[in-house]
UniProtKB/Swiss-Prot annotation:
BsuMI restriction activity requires YdiR, YdiS and YdjA. Transmembrane segments: none annotated. Keywords: Endonuclease, Hydrolase, Nuclease, Restriction system. Induction: Constitutively expressed during exponential growth. Encoded in an operon with ydiR and ydiS. It holds the Pfam family RE_LlaJI. This is Type II restriction enzyme BsuMI component YdjA. Disruption phenotype: Not essential; its disruption results in increased transformation by plasmid DNA carrying multiple BsuMI target sequences. Triple deletion ydiO-ydiP-ydjA leads to loss of susceptibility to MspJI, which only digests C-methylated DNA. It catalyses: Endonucleolytic cleavage of DNA to give specific double-stranded fragments with terminal 5'-phosphates. GO terms for molecular function: type II site-specific deoxyribonuclease activity. It comes from the Bacteria. The lineage of its organism: Bacteria, Bacillati, Bacillota, Bacilli, Bacillales. A P subtype restriction enzyme that recognizes the double-stranded sequence 5'-CTCGAG-3'; the cleavage site is unknown.
C-alpha cells in the first residue's frame, strides 16, 4: 500500500506522539466524536473498531479481544472479514449515530474505504466506464439506419419499387480515451494503492497510464464534466459509478486543503455487532421473549394494574432436542476482554449484567421446565481451533439460582457462519452443552479435592493439639 497504513487495537494504551504522527491534527475531532480518549497518564485509547483515514494515512483498529502478536497478513485477513461483517450488519440494521457505516457514494460522510470497495468491486464485475459513440458504415454488420439510408442513398427502382443494394449500418464504438474513462482509471489506481490489499483485490489488474493525472489542477472542470454526464445517463450502474468518481475528486481536493479531513468506516459500539452475530448463529427464538411476564404497575388509589409494555429481553434464547432429550439455552453475548490473571480479574462484566442474566433464568423458569437448562455468557476469543471453551462461572451465593457459565466462542468460526448465512447445527449445540457439562464436572472434582485436603489439614492440626 502506498499510503502509510498501521494497525492498532481497541482499548489499548498508545503513546500520544505515536498517534499524532499518524493522524496529525485530527485528534481533537476524534476525541469530540468519542472515538479516541486520553487517560490520566496522557496515553490515548481507541473506543472504536474500523478504519480511519485522514487523506494521507490510513489506520485500522482491530477489536480488543484480538491477539496482539498477529502478523501483518493475519491482521489484514481478519480485518477484511470484519469489513464484510460490517457491510452485512449495516445492511440489516438501521445505523445509529455511534456507527459510521454510510454507504451513499455521493454523501459527504461516506468513507474513502467504501468508495474504494465500490470502485474496485464494480471494476472486477463490469470493467471500465464505457463512453460510447455511434458511427455509420456502408454495408456494415450493425443495425440498418433506414432513415439515413433512404435520405442519402439512391435506390434502384423496379416496377416502381425502390431497392437499396447498399445501406448505412450503425456501429457503436467505445471511446477509450474519453476524459471520464481516464478519471475512472486514475481513481482505480489511487484507491487500489490505498486499500486494495486490505480489501482482498490483490489480483486485480488495470491500466495505470492515468496515475499521474493532474486532478487538483482541473478538479472543478472534471467535476462539471461528470455532473453533465450524470444528467444524461439513465443506467443505474453508470450513475452510481459517476457519483463515486465525483466524490473521489472532491476528496482529492479536500486532502490538500488546510482544513482537517477525516474519513471513518466502523463503529464505537462493536458489542452490538457481536450480539447480532451470536444471536444469528445460535438461531435466537424471539417468541420466547414475548412470553416473559411484564412488570405490573399498581395504582393504590383505584387499585388499577397497568402492564409495562417492555419486559426482560435476553440476547439469545434457544431450545433444541438431541437424542430425545430437550435443552434450553439462555445466552448473553458479552463483548468483554475478560481475563483471570491469577487472583486478579480484569475486563469482566458488571454486577448489573450478572443480576440481569440470573433474573432471565428465573423469568424463563416455566418455559424451560422439563428441559435441561444452561445459562451462559458468550465472550469472543481469537482462538480459531476451539469453537467453545468453558473457562469459569459467576453467581451470587445468596441466590438459589444456578451460576452463569463463562464461555469463550471462537470469533473466527462464528464470523464464518454469519457471512455464509449458516447457523450452529444441533450437533454443534449439543457440543456446546457437553463442554459446559464436562467443565462443571472438572470444577466439581477440583472443588471436592480442595475442600477434602483442607479438611484433612485442619484435622491433623487439631489432632496435634
Amino acid at each position: 500500500m502506498d499510503k502509510s497504513s498501521k494497525f492498532f487495537f481497541e482499548d489499548q494504551k498508545y503513546n500520544k506522539e505515536r498517534i499524532v504522527r499518524v493522524l496529525g491534527g485530527n485528534l481533537a475531532l476524534l476525541k469530540s466524536k468519542g472515538i479516541l480518549y486520553e487517560d490520566s497518564s496522557g496515553d490515548l485509547i481507541f473506543n472504536y473498531v474500523g478504519v480511519i483515514s485522514n487523506g494521507r494515512n490510513v489506520i485500522f483498529i482491530l477489536p480488543k479481544y484480538c491477539n496482539r502478536h498477529l502478523d501483518e497478513h493475519s491482521k489484514r485477513t481478519l480485518f477484511n472479514k470484519l469489513l464484510k461483517i460490517f457491510k452485512k450488519y449495516s445492511g440489516l440494521n438501521k445505523s445509529r449515530e455511534s456507527d459510521y457505516f454510510v454507504s451513499e457514494l455521493d454523501s459527504d460522510e461516506v468513507s474513502d474505504f467504501m468508495i474504494a470497495d465500490y470502485l474496485l468491486n464494480d471494476f472486477s464485475l463490469n470493467g471500465y466506464y464505457q463512453k460510447k459513440f455511434t458511427e455509420y458504415e456502408i454495408d456494415g454488420e450493425g443495425i440498418i439506419d433506414w432513415s439515413k439510408t433512404v435520405n442519402e442513398i439512391t435506390p434502384v427502382f423496379s416496377k416502381g419499387v425502390p431497392y437499396y443494394f447498399s445501406t448505412y449500418n450503425e456501429v457503436v464504438q467505445k471511446d477509450e480515451y474519453h476524459l471520464i474513462v481516464k478519471i475512472h482509471k486514475w481513481a482505480l489506481s489511487k484507491y487500489f494503492n490505498d486499500f486494495g490489499v486490505i480489501l482482498g483485490f490483490t489480483g486485480l489488474e488495470f491500466d495505470k497510464s492515468c496515475d499521474g493525472m493532474k486532478i487538483l489542477d482541473y478538479a472543478d472542470f472534471f467535476g462539471s464534466v461528470i455532473n453533465k454526464e450524470i444528467v444524461n445517463t439513465y443506467v443505474d450502474r453508470d450513475v452510481k459509478l459517476l457519483k463515486a468518481l465525483k466524490t473521489a475528486i472532491d476528496r482529492e481536493e479536500n486532502q490538500f486543503s488546510k482544513r482537517p479531513t477525516l474519513s471513518l468506516y466502523g463503529t464505537k459500539y462493536f458489542h452490538r455487532v457481536w450480539e447480532e452475530v451470536c444471536k444469528t448463529v445460535f438461531s435466537h427464538v424471539n417468541e420466547y421473549v414475548k412470553k416473559i411476564s411484564r412488570p405490573n404497575w399498581i395504582n393504590f388509589t383505584d387499585i388499577e394494574v397497568n402492564k409495562e409494555k417492555k419486559t426482560l429481553e435476553p440476547d439469545i434464547i434457544k431450545a433444541f432436542e438431541y437424542r430425545s432429550k430437550e435443552y434450553f439455552l439462555i445466552l448473553d453475548a458479552k463483548y468483554y476482554n475478560i481475563n483471570f490473571d491469577g487472583k486478579k480479574l480484569e475486563g469482566n462484566p458488571g454486577v448489573e449484567d450478572i443480576t440481569k442474566q440470573l433474573l432471565y433464568d428465573k423469568a424463563l423458569e416455566k418455559l424451560s421446565r422439563g428441559k435441561t437448562k444452561h445459562n451462559a455468557f458468550l465472550f469472543p476469543s481469537s482462538n480459531s481451533t476451539n469453537t467453545f471453551k468453558v473457562f469459569g462461572s459467576v453467581d451470587f451465593d445468596f441466590l438459589d439460582i444456578a451460576a452463569v457459565t463463562l464461555v469463550y466462542i471462537s470469533a473466527e468460526q462464528v464470523y464464518n457462519l454469519y457471512l455464509e448465512n449458516k447457523t450452529f447445527s444441533t450437533d454443534d449445540l449439543f457440543k456446546f452443552v457437553s463442554e459446559i457439562n464436562k467443565s462443571k464436572k472438572r470444577h466439581s472434582v477440583i472443588t471436592s479435592t480442595l475442600y477434602g485436603n483442607m479438611f484433612l489439614f485442619t484435622k491433623r492440626l487439631s489432632d496435634k493439639n
